[in-house]
Amino acid sequence: MSNSILSKLNVGERSPVNRTHSSRTEAEKSSLFRFVRRKINSPWLACVPLTALIVAIWNAAAIAQDTEIVNITVETVNENVATLQGTLNAIWILIAAILVIFMNAGFGMLETGLCRQKNAVNILTKNLIVFALATIAYWAIGFSLMFGSSGNPFVGFGGFFLSGDHTNYGLSPFPEGLPVAVFFLFQVAFSATAATIVSGAVAERIKFNEFLIFSVLLVGIAYPITGHWVWDAGGWLYTMGFMDFAGSTVVHSVGGWAALAGAFLLGPRLGKFVDGRPGAIPGHNMGFAMLGCLILWIGWFGFNPGSQLAADQACAYIAVTTNLAASAGGLTATFTSWLKDGKPDLTMVINGVLAGLVGITAGCAGVSYWGSVIIGGIAGILVVYSVAFFDKIKIDDPVGAISVHLVNGVWGTLAVGFFNMEKGLFYGGGINQLIIQIVGILAIGAFTAIFSFVVWAILKQTMGIRVSGEEEMIGLDIGEHGMEAYTGFVKETDSFGSAVSGATVPE
């Protein structure tokens, strides 16, 4: 019995009293667990708002810091964009300057092709050396007379030998970041163009030394003074509102007036006028002439768009108006010479293209596409009749430089008063701009013509400007340079020394 009782006690058969006590104990343990858990969790629950506050403060600080960083970044980006734009401007103007400088090769090819082979070396030498002379003369005094900020409305002064900065030359209107050196190079290319124009009109009879002297004075004094009137912000024509975007007058008419004075005082070539009537003296290489024209056409895409002085979208518009005018000039000159003389003359086609380019140069940035076609088309017609006119009055111009650059430089400058989309007469701008254009043409023409005539006359009286008749007959290649452009060829000439054919030397 005792074992049975023990087994019951040890095996676990509990009485109802024991089961009740056990249930109460478990409930108490559960309640205690929940109590303890609540006590333990309460501090962590209190940390939730604090944590949220810390996170909010952290985010606010981060946002403020990010805003500051964004502001700094925007300022840095703007500075970098401005610097990049300035660099692009400088690169574009440098490329444009190189294109304009290469136009000297075009002038050399054009003039050589339209003249006789016995004068080819002389013409090539003049076109090459004139750029070197122009660079030195314009560097020494020309750039300062044109843009020096210490001058007055009639002439600039200060910063000779390119010794100043933007403040010395008054370049503040020009785009930010454009170096003075780049602007100088672009302008010196323009100045050389004015002197090169003269070379063609006085070709085949001008003394080499005297031509160089005149070129230095033109580029160093006359061209910068009139250029100051128009392109410097303090110039009197600039203040008046005269418009010549890329130089129909400042470059081309100036060169044309100087050429006219020189051709007049030189007189015609031997054999040009027989019994008072003009005779043809054909050029020796039309291939050279055509190639020269094409080089000039390409170079004009630096000449006109480069005058924007910035690498922006306006350059493309200017390039299109320039190309349209050149094309229209070439076409109208072709058909005009065809109708006038019965056949299309290649020399007139060439001069028509160049006339269109000269004509659009003043207004290329401010006329419509249709306006550029009309301006170029009229220029092509003018050049054909202008060449005939100067022949009639016995002004001998071997390459038609006066007709291309002077006549159409004047026309292109006048055309601004008609076709400019803001101030032109045909666009409701009234006659005021046209009057201003006429004043500028007359003022620059009078100054340049008088200056050139006086200088040529002094040179003629003191040193002589024309080679001897014998030297002209032999050719300036031998007389002035002691060499020939084409060795190994026999040159057949007419009674006036004009080469009419060539043949290889027989063995």
Swiss-Prot record:
Domain of life of the source: Bacteria
Membrane spanning stretches: 44-64, 90-110, 128-148, 154-174, 178-198, 211-231, 245-265, 286-306, 315-335, 347-367, 370-390, 399-419, 438-458
Keywords, in A-Z order: Ammonia transport, Cell membrane, Membrane, Transmembrane, Transmembrane helix, Transport
A GO BP annotation: ammonium transmembrane transport
Subcellular location(s) of the protein: Cell membrane
InterPro entries: Ammonium/urea_transptr, Ammonium_transpt, Ammonium_transpt_CS, NH4_transpt_AmtB-like_dom
GO CC field: plasma membrane
Topology in membrane: Multi-pass membrane protein
Gene Ontology terms for molecular function: ammonium channel activity
Region (Disordered): 1-23
PROSITE patterns: AMMONIUM_TRANSP (PS01219)
Record PANTHER family: AMMONIUM TRANSPORTER, AMMONIUM TRANSPORTER SLL0108-RELATED
Family: Belongs to the ammonia transporter channel (TC 1.A.11.2) family.
Protein name according to UniProt: Putative ammonium transporter sll0108
Organism this protein belongs to: Synechocystis sp. (strain ATCC 27184 / PCC 6803 / Kazusa)
Lineage, top ranks: Bacteria, Bacillati, Cyanobacteriota, Cyanophyceae, Synechococcales
